[in-house]
Amino acid sequence: MNKGGAQQKGHSSKQAENIVLVGRTGNGKSATGNSLIGKKVFASKAHASGVTMKCQTHGVVTKDGHKINVIDTPGLFDLSVSAEYISKEIVRCLTLAEGGIHAVLLVLSARTRITQEEENTLRTLQALFGSQILDYVVVVFTGGDVLEECKETLEDYLGRDCPTFIKEVMRMSSNRKVVIDNKTHDEGKKAEQVHKLLSLVDDIRRSKCGEAYTDDTYHMIKEESEKLRKHHEELESKNYSEECAAEMKNQSLILYKENLKQMSEQLEKKLKDAAEAQEKALSKMTQENNELNLALKIHIPLPPITPCNIL
């Protein structure tokens, strides 16, 4: 898979904008999706049996005319999640994103400390889609009610203890960030929050000239889906018996799923390779730091330290 490309799509009443929610479990992805939709369609962690286990999608036309397709992902980037599971759900996500990805909402929480899992989210996104995906990222901070209670702005919160990698994400995503209170019952506030968030999505559309993010995997999925559709149409146009047509459709569906599985396995390998490279880079950096500390203690010259870009 290459670093990704873009697919020309105008902002029209016919083409929905695909907005993908990513982030750690418990950060409020599903609640943010519900705020965008305007009603509860995605189950949140607060409901024990309702945590998102598979990518889900829901489309809506907002009050100000945005036609959006919100894709809620499970906690794909939690540290406990396997590369196999991530890859399968990414393929599912791309299948749901007809026309490409128009925005990725990286959901963080102002209620909790930003952890290694958030940094893992960023690394995994880049490993899967390349650094160009950051051109489509909006950083969403949930827990706006907590900041209000503390009489803090988002800038106050970030100024207190903002990890370097978050600053880097915001820099690379043109500082597109927003705070949202998913618990508010104030209809005016709800509308204002959604408007502000979708304005940032519009900023992405304008900066990319209406082009959605796509990559090799997306195009392969689209090609397989189109082949399946055409084959089913061809079967329906011929005089096969109902039983025979159903059997042939089932066989083509099995082949389609097998091809998607192969794509998933390719992504899984890509993730594992990226994780291995990251581990080696961290190990090398640790070794060089240890050598530096030792040299400072015994005052011996050292060779120059090789720069190591973690992100």
From Swiss-Prot:
GTP binds at G23, R24, T25, G26, N27, G28, K29, S30, A31, S44, N182. Residues 72-75 are annotated as: G3. Residues 23-30 are annotated as: G1. Residues 142-145 are annotated as: G4. Induction: Up-regulated by brassinolides. Down-regulated by 2-aminoethoxyvinylglycine (AVG), high CO(2), isoxaben, and propiconazole treatments. Residues 181-183 are annotated as: G5. The keyword Coiled coil applies. Residues 14-222 form the AIG1-type G domain. Residues 218-295 form a coiled coil. Gene3D superfamilies: P-loop containing nucleotide triphosphate hydrolases. Residues 50-54 are annotated as: G2. Keywords: Coiled coil, GTP-binding, Nucleotide-binding. One of its GO terms (molecular function) is GTP binding. InterPro entries: G_AIG1, GIMA/IAN/Toc, P-loop_NTPase. PANTHER family: GTPASE, IMAP FAMILY MEMBER-RELATED, IMMUNE-ASSOCIATED NUCLEOTIDE-BINDING PROTEIN 7. This is Immune-associated nucleotide-binding protein 7. The lineage of its organism: Eukaryota, Viridiplantae, Streptophyta, Embryophyta, Tracheophyta.
